[in-house]
Amino acid sequence: MPATGKICNFDCIYCENGFNADRRTPDAFVTLPTLREALEAKLVEMSSTGELPDVITLAGNGEPTASPVFPEVVDASIHLRDEYAPEARVAVLSNGTYADRPDVHRALLRVDDNLLKLDTVDPDYIRFVDRPAKGYDIEHQIEVFASFCGHVIIQSLFLTGTWQGHDVDNTGDTYVMPWLDALRRIGPRSVAVYTIARDTPAAGLRKATPQSLDSIAKRVRALGIDCSASY
């Protein structure tokens, strides 16, 4: 992703990188040679100090899989990991909207940790809080996530509060029960539930309580799916 702004097809009201309109950039995605050189330089530096990374994460201020060279970036990251930090894992944090593209799907199958976003399955909530680009279809996303046959970690953010006079609490049964049904269909390796940890561009948002997150995580584990909760 470019360092000068944000490129994303979601415009989440809780995004720590701000609203898309406030972070527009004339710059394109980082090129493959630039990324490869930067990653190798960092790994060489870390290797010299004996402090190698546990995880190499492809994320950034936007949607990494939107990059036209995303599959090549994955291959380069795996190659450099194997050369300099063979014990490290390669992870991708994604909203999953490009995971139905064959080249992106294959690339996500190659990484160790394929983390895909699913905050809720309620279309109105998604439109109001996650604000994806036109054409987003939650049923299609669930089917795509299930197509990884377990090679997927679902990341779900829970929060409370209000925005523009509307309640944005997705910790209650109205949202959690259908979300649990979606997890059954997806069959992920694990689930990570968490809440906001930094300032958000939208005012009025609040953290989900540890008690709420623990309760949600317990219900996921009852499905036979490993689940972590971060406060």
Region roles according to the model:
Residues 3-19:
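Local cysteine-cluster metal-coordination motifs and their immediate loop/turn environment
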Residues 14-110:
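Conserved Radical SAM active-site core
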Residues 152, 160, 202-231:
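Short acidic, glycine/proline-enriched helix-loop-strand junctions
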Residues 41-44, 79, 181, 185, ...:
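A generic structural signal for well-ordered alpha-helical segments enriched in polar/charged residues
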Residues 66-194, 199-206:
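Conserved AdoMet/S-adenosylmethionine-binding subsite of the radical SAM
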